[in-house]
From Swiss-Prot:
Residues 96-142, 174-418 form a coiled coil. Residues 1-20 form the signal peptide. Residues 1-23 are annotated as: Disordered. The keyword Lipid biosynthesis does not apply. This is Myocardial zonula adherens protein. The gene is MYZAP. PANTHER family: GDOWN1, MYOCARDIAL ZONULA ADHERENS PROTEIN. The keyword Cell membrane applies. Detected in heart, liver, skeletal muscle, placenta, small intestine, lung, prostate and testis. Expressed in arrector pili muscle (at protein level). GO terms for cellular component: anchoring junction; cortical actin cytoskeleton; cytoplasmic side of plasma membrane; I band; RNA polymerase II, core complex; Z disc. It is a peripheral membrane protein. Its main location: cytoplasm. The lineage of its organism: Eukaryota, Metazoa, Chordata, Craniata, Vertebrata. Interacts with DSP, MPRIP and TJP1/ZO1. Interaction with MPRIP inhibits the activation of transcription factor SRF. Interacts with GRIN1. Interacts with DYNLL1. Residues 1-10 have a biased composition (Polar residues).
């Protein structure tokens, strides 16, 4: 028989607790089994003893009670100095075990994250350093290439800036001339409108005078009828006096009518000649405007041609720079043919660039010639303006003569009214000239279907942008 001593210690949840003791020790059930060293206890016996001791519920003479449900026990073996083996049984609740397992999982996850972050950041830093070194080497090479390219392009840009400044100054001169021409044309149009209005007013006045003469002729016929019907004693004396007065008045009236008709015909001829001159001036102005339009279109075509030449020259310069960069590298025996081909291509490109420069110079000369032609057209327009001013002066003189004739007609009508009141037997008859109202001509006004100032502004903006 084996001798063994066992001690069961059960700590219940209702026992008194010290204020500093943890709450986890309340659910610990300790079971000590002391086995002598001479006779080792087999494992099966130990398991049976553990099972039996789990069923025990004694603690220092306390009455038996059932252990709480959902408790997990753990057995710990240890050996004392007296070579006695002891087994300690610990009991935990499932909620405590779950909390500890979750705590352990959280600790492991945080440790794994820290490890990945430390080693991952180190690898990323190494990769970034490598990329930065590569980018620095590439940027140094690009910087050297760009410095060479900038040096070549700066000289070309200086030349093109000089050309652009010259073209801009020429375009500004063209703008000024075109603005002056438009202002002069607008002034001429206003003057022609005023002339037409004055001519129409004078024709209206002439029609009114003719109507008044017709009314006077009707009144004279009525007076004749009255004279014939009168049967007074002094008819003969009065007839003689009236005949004398009538003859005198008729002579004066005929003279005034002849003068009036002659002056009227002269005025009509002069106005017709002035209208013809104005029409010719308008035609010449239209021709000048058409020529200005053609010059404007030609200048636009030349600007587009220069833009295309500049683009082609830029492309050729880029090709030449590419060939020069290829030629500047180290040469081997296999690259000699390629080097010769590049030299020939670069020589042809230089020749084409020189040819394009010559073409641009020729186009600039053409633009200057067109500017000179526009200046000559401006001088011609000034001459036409002087001619129109002279015609306006003549028309004002004719208006004065017309006013003078009107005053004479007014005087004659007043004297005619006085004689009618005094005698009441005088009849006046006159044959009026046919009215020439249908001889009015329509003045063709010059018109322009475009705005040259805006066109020149567009061309200058294109030049500045290129």
């Amino acid at each position: 028989m084996l001798r063994s001593t066992s001690t069961v210690t059960l700590l219940s949840g209702g026992a008194a607790r010290t204020p500093g003791a943890p709450s986890r020790r309340a659910n610990v059930c300790r079971l000590r089994l002391t086995v002598p060293p001479e006779s080792p206890v087999p494992e099966q016996c130990e398991k049976k003893i553990e099972r039996k001791e789990q069923l025990l519920d004694l603690s220092n003479g306390e009455p038996t009670r059932k252990l709480p449900q959902g408790v997990v026990y753990g057995v710990v073996r240890r050996s004392d100095q007296n070579q006695q083996k002891e087994m300690v049984v610990y009991g935990w609740s499932t909620s405590q075990l779950k909390e500890e397992m979750n705590y352990i999982k959280d600790v492991r996850a945080t440790l794994e994250k820290v490890r990945k972050r430390m080693y991952g950041d180190y690898d990323e830093m190494r990769q970034k350093i490598r990329q930065l070194t590569q980018e620095l080497s590439v940027s140094h090479a690009q910087q050297e290439y760009l410095e060479n390219h900038i040096q070549t392009q700066s000289s070309a840009l200086d030349r093109f800036n000089a050309m652009n400044s010259a073209l801009a100054s020429d375009s500004i001169g063209l703008q000024k001339t075109l603005v002056d021409v438009t202002l002069e044309n607008s002034n001429i149009k206003d003057q022609i409108r005023n002339l037409q209005q004055t001519y129409e007013a004078s024709m209206d006045k002439l029609r009114e005078k003719q109507r008044q003469l017709e009314v006077a002729q009707v009144e004279n016929q009525l007076l004749k009828m009255k004279v014939e019907s009168s049967q007074e004693a002094n008819a003969e004396v009065m007839r003689e006096m009236t005949k004398k007065l009538y003859s005198q008045y008729e002579e004066k009236l005929q003279e005034e009518q002849r003068k009036h008709s002659a002056e009227k015909e002269a005025l009509l001829e002069e106005t017709n000649s002035f209208l013809k001159a104005i029409e010719e001036a308008n035609k010449k102005m239209q021709a000048a405007e058409i020529s200005l339009e053609e010059k404007d279109q030609r200048i636009g075509e030349l600007d587009r041609l220069i833009e295309r030449m500049e683009k082609e020259r830029h492309q050729l310069q880029l090709q030449l720079l590419e060939h020069e960069t290829e030629m500047s590298g180290e040469l081997t025996d296999s690259d000699k043919e390629r080097y010769q081909q590049l030299e020939e291509a670069s020589a042809s490109l230089r020749e084409r660039i020189r040819h394009l420069d010559d073409m641009v110079h020729c186009q600039q000369k053409k633009v200057k010639q067109m500017v000179e032609e526009i200046e000559s057209l401006k001088k011609k327009l000034q001459q036409k303006q002087l001619l129109i001013l002279q015609l306006l002066e003549k028309i004002s003189f004719l208006e004065g003569e017309n006013n003078e004739l009107q005053s004479r007609l007014d005087y004659l009508t007043e004297t005619q009214a006085k004689t009618e009141v005094e005698t009441r037997e005088i009849g006046v008859g006159c044959d009026l000239l046919p009215s020439q109202t249908g001889r009015t001509r329509e003045i063709v006004m010059p018109s322009r279907n475009y705005t040259p100032y805006t066109r020149v502004l567009e061309l200058t903006m294109k030049k500045t942008l290129t």
